[in-house]
Amino acid sequence: MRCVHFGECGSCTLALPYEDQLNFKANFIADKFREFFDGELEIFSSKPQRYRSRAEFGIWHENDEIYYTMHGSRSKFIKISECLKVDESIAALMPRLLEELGTSNELKSKIFGVEFISTSELCAVILLYHKRLEGLEAAFSELAKRLGVKIVARSRGQKISSDERELCDSFEINGLRYALNFGDSAFIQPNKCVNEKMISWAMNAVQNAEDMLEMYCGHGNFTIPLAGKFRRVLATEISKSSIANALKNCERNGIGNIKFLRMSAEELMSAFSGERGFRRLEGVNLADFTFSHVLVDPPRAGLEASVINFIKNYENIVYISCNPQTLYENLKELSLTHKATKFAMFDQFANTNHIECGVVLKKR
């Protein structure tokens, strides 16, 4: 990776040719998890550059000029002129946005950050401010028209959108195309190519399927494509906006066998144990489901002990992890009742130390 900021920017940390990076990560995962899995590790690579469809940068003000910034490796931040990780759409947009903002005192005043999201249909730019935004609606709308993007401006307690277009991305899994709506503040997998590989791997890992229970489902990134493998799916998520988009995604993709519930993991477990009732479960009889599989895609903190004890009851577990250390700790407990039958490494973030994994566990 020939980035002019490598070594100063704290984002990319692996100064190795890409194949060597991949081998380094694969060897690390194989060694770390050898006590749980002694089969063949499946390895899924990324493009070395231009793979991120979502990226965030700080904005630095200096002598009436503004610059993009990133966290520095030896300093709090560094000014950057380019980023080789962002995809082609974002890379082309970055200098144009900076030029537009730099020529407008009202738009550059008190701005401290910017986020880019590119989809197959639309690019969105989220501008972050330390000031009130009243009276700037027209300026944001004109900026959006000049750049050909959707602008979302945010300040504490305020949000202004240049238009009402929704973010939606499409992808192909095993020959089938899907389109998913998501919110501008929702979590998404920023590496589209590797995300497709993750979903395809999970689909191919499912055998002898009946019903699926999914926790931490978001807007349906895994749920929607996997639904075709199961008779019925029950999927839970705590975010109200993500559930709203998940419901839209069912309709958009013509899928009718998923029941989405806005529930935390703790609430779901209480519902299953019968400790309390929930109005959100009206019309849903949990006893009607025959869950052959449970899919979990938790945050970096991994699964809490109560969730581990809960999912131990299921025959098959598909665990998607964004943190090898918490995955390792969770597998210490899950391996008491389940055996890892498939293990995959997904290189979501080339040139960094970040590693994502997928594990299929079957009850002993």
Curated annotation (Swiss-Prot):
InterPro entries: MeTrfase_TrmA_AS, SAM-dependent_MTases_sf, TrmA_MeTrfase, U5_MeTrfase_fam
GO biological process: methylation; tRNA processing
Active site residues per record: C322 (nucleophile), E356 (proton acceptor)
Domain of life: Bacteria
Keywords: Methyltransferase, S-adenosyl-L-methionine, Transferase, tRNA processing
Positions in coiled-coil regions: none
Binding-site positions, S-adenosyl-L-methionine: Q189, Y216, N221, E237, D297
EC number: 2.1.1.-, 2.1.1.35
Any single Gene Ontology cellular-component annotation: cytosol
Catalytic activities: uridine(54) in tRNA + S-adenosyl-L-methionine = 5-methyluridine(54) in tRNA + S-adenosyl-L-homocysteine + H(+); uridine(341) in tmRNA + S-adenosyl-L-methionine = 5-methyluridine(341) in tmRNA + S-adenosyl-L-homocysteine + H(+)
GO molecular function, one term: tRNA (uracil(54)-C5)-methyltransferase activity, S-adenosyl methionine-dependent
Catalytic EC class: transferase
Function description: Dual-specificity methyltransferase that catalyzes the formation of 5-methyluridine at position 54 (m5U54) in all tRNAs, and that of position 341 (m5U341) in tmRNA (transfer-mRNA).
Family: Belongs to the class I-like SAM-binding methyltransferase superfamily. RNA M5U methyltransferase family. TrmA subfamily.
HAMAP family: RNA_methyltr_TrmA (MF_01011)
Full protein name: tRNA/tmRNA (uracil-C(5))-methyltransferase
Species of origin: Campylobacter curvus (strain 525.92)
Lineage: Bacteria, Pseudomonadati, Campylobacterota, Epsilonproteobacteria, Campylobacterales
